[in-house]
């Protein structure tokens, strides 16, 4: 695995992302060309994200994930997509982006828009890296009760944990993730770097 990784990608504009790869991974078009260089160095979280990216080749086989949390509008989704692009740029790695609110029985069985035609469930459970974006929003739709969707989200997180596959999660608060299922807090604290995204300043 390590032989496929390129240390010079962070991302570098000399290697622009392949559009078809972005489409096949369901990455939002808005995030196709975002760069860590656009984040001001004064942002404390930036170095932790850089460190995670630089050590992906070492932690991938251990299933080391990343949980990005913070207020809405701080760029968590963009950061997650930048990291996901690293997995795709550094080797022939299958990757996938999914909104947490779209993870339900019907959504999981739709065909993805890739030549292979993998069902979403296969992508979520088998891709080397997966982003689950805005985790916790499905709880807000039904007040304090956990919705049916959350059960599927929990299955994805636990399944990837058991198979030691890295997952990148964005949320407004870690507590929203912990509340989805019994024991998830222990999983997150064991296998994820937890990074608060705040005070972001996107240049350019």
Where are the model-predicted features located?
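Residue-level preference for the first positions of well-ordered beta-strands
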Residues: 63-67, 94, 129, 166-168
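P-loop NTPase Walker A phosphate-binding motif
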Residues: 78-91
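Phosphate-binding P-loop
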Residues: 55-63
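Walker A/P-loop nucleotide-binding motif
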Residues: 62-80
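Walker B catalytic acidic pair
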Residues: 133-135
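Short glycine-rich substrate-engagement loop in P-loop NTPases that contacts/grips substrate
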Residues: 46, 50, 88-127
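A short, basic N-terminal segment
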Residues: 1-52, 194-204
């Amino acid at each position: 695995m390590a032989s496929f990784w390129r240390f010079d990608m962070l991302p570098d504009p000399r290697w622009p992302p392949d559009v078809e790869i972005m489409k096949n991974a369901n990455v939002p078009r808005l995030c196709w060309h975002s760069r860590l260089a656009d984040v001001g160095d004064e942002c404390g979280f930036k170095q932790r994200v850089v460190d995670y990216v630089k050590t992906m080749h070492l932690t991938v086989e251990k299933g080391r994930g990343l949980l990005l949390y913070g207020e809405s509008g701080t760029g968590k989704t963009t950061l997650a997509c930048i990291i996901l692009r690293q997995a795709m740029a550094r080797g022939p790695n299958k990757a996938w982006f999914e909104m947490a609110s779209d993870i339900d029985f019907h959504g999981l069985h739709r065909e993805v828009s890739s030549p292979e035609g993998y069902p979403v469930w296969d992508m979520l459970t088998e891709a080397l890296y997966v982003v689950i974006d805005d985790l916790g929003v499905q709880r807000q739709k039904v007040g304090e009760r956990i919705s049916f969707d959350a059960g599927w989200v929990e299955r994805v997180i636990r399944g990837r944990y058991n198979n030691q596959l890295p997952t990148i999660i964005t949320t407004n608060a870690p507590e929203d993730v912990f509340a989805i299922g019994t024991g998830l807090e222990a999983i997150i604290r064991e296998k994820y770097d937890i990074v608060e995204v705040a005070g972001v300043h996107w240049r350019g």
